[in-house]
From Swiss-Prot:
The chain crosses the membrane at residues 48-68, 80-100, 121-139, 163-183, 212-232, 263-283, 299-319. This is Neuromedin-U receptor 2. Signal peptide: none annotated. Residues 1-47, 101-120, 184-211, 284-298 are extracellular.
């Protein structure tokens, strides 16, 4: 995340210029200009970050591993979830350590202009890639629910990879404006000499440029996408509710609906959690961009928002694997194939499966296939095009890949 609290502190201190000449101590003068060298919330926030780091890194590595390892997990939808996991790992492994270091030592910034550009570009790129990935998977799910035959033809792995290439390319491109206005700022004594250890990574161009960029990107990469996503899931909800009242093709519905509803439910929860976790981040940025004159009460409110937004920002990088494990039986089964047996045995003693949640899972050396998300009630013996070949084909491993690559 971008560090704004020191910037707001600097603006407050511009009103106190007459008192600067009375400060002869370098540390005191630097503290007046840049604020405290170490955040007073360093210890509690670091403890929270450490927990998020462990859960997020382990969880997202598992997500990446099961998608790469199991052929049947390489679906278009899972490719978008893989992209989210990669962006989360970038934030946790590269962004969080920088954030913790800056909380421990706000200044000087030790990594030079290149490090400043990298830090800014990283957070901007991940921010844009995450929301674009969530938007894309929501559009794919919308097509799969409302236009299933079109999705069957067009929703392919190759298409998903091409879309993800565009997503990450656009994310890097749109990160450049904000990155270009950041740099290393040095502070000076009244006599014009540089204050030792005063280098900070911050905005070095006129603030109106920064404010404009933040307001535009918040609109394009949060407000508009979340509005579109909300409409899409509303329409999907209407469609799924309508399907519940249809009596025709009971066997087909019995096979398709549980999986379709389960995946849609999981993605809806994913989007909802994403929106909640990222809202403070954008509130933080917009708050800073709209304040023209800083006062102590405004600075106090902003600093509180900044801390909360930081926790939720990193929390969003850790919760996705938990959502997959809770709401997707396919991911649950895949996780079991990569988790050490000792951990699985301990978990099985505490959570024995009940009869109401039976699953038909077939594990081979290269495949992990789940027939249905939940066991649905049995209908009288009827056959359809979909139901006639599904059980035997799965058991013999002769199902074409395109049949297994369900969204």
């Amino acid at each position: 995340m971008e560090k704004h609290e020191n910037v707001s502190w600097m603006y407050q201190q511009e009103l106190k210029d007459p008192f600067k000449k009375y400060l002869n101590n370098t540390d005191d003068y630097l503290a007046l200009l840049c604020g405290p060298r170490r955040s007073h919330l360093f210890l509690p926030v670091t403890a929270v970050y450490a927990l998020i780091f462990v859960v997020g890194v382990v969880g997202n590595l598992l997500v990446c591993l099961v998608i790469l390892r199991h052929q049947t997990m390489k679906t278009p939808t899972n490719y978008y979830l893989f992209s989210l996991a990669v962006s989360d790992l970038l934030v946790l492994l590269l962004g969080m350590p920088l954030e913790v270091y800056e909380m421990w030592r706000n200044y000087p910034f030790l990594f030079g202009p290149v490090g400043c550009y990298f830090k800014t570009a990283l957070f901007e790129t991940v921010c844009f890639a995450s929301i674009l990935s969530v938007t894309t998977v929501s559009v794919e799910r919308y097509v799969a629910v409302l236009h299933p035959f079109r999705a069957k033809l067009k929703s392919t792995r190759g298409r998903a990879l091409r879309i993800l290439g565009i997503v990450w390319g656009l994310s890097v491109l749109f990160s450049l404006p904000n990155t270009s206005i950041h740099g290393i700022k040095l502070h000076y004594f009244p006599n014009g000499s540089i204050i030792p250890g005063s280098a900070t990574c911050t905005v070095i161009k006129p603030m109106w440029i920064y404010n404009f960029i933040i307001q535009v990107t918040s609109l394009l990469f949060y407000i508009l996408p979340m509005t579109v996503i909300s409409v899409l899931y509303y329409l999907m909800g209407l469609k799924l509710k309508k399907d519940q009242h249809l009596e025709a093709d009971k066997v087909t519905a019995n096979i398709q609906r549980p999986s379709r509803k389960s995946v849609t439910k999981m993605l809806f929860v994913l989007v909802l959690v994403f929106a909640i976790c990222w809202a403070p981040f954008h509130i933080d940025r917009l708050f800073f961009s709209f304040v023209e004159e800083w006062t102590e009460p405004l600075a106090a409110v902003f600093n509180l928002i900044h801390v909360v937004s930081g926790v939720f920002f990193y929390l969003s990088s850790a919760v996705n694997p938990i959502i997959y494990n809770l709401l997707s039986h396919r991911f649950q089964a895949a996780f079991r194939t990569v988790i050490p047996p000792s951990c699985q045995q301990q978990h099985s003693h505490n959570h024995s499966p009940g009869p109401s949640m039976q699953r038909n899972i077939f594990l081979t050396e290269c495949h992990l296939v789940e027939l249905t998300e939940d066991v649905a009630p049995q209908f009288p013996r009827q056959l359809s095009v979909l139901s006639s070949q599904l059980p035997t084909a799965l058991c013999t491993g002769q199902v074409p890949r395109k049949e297994l690559a369900k969204s």
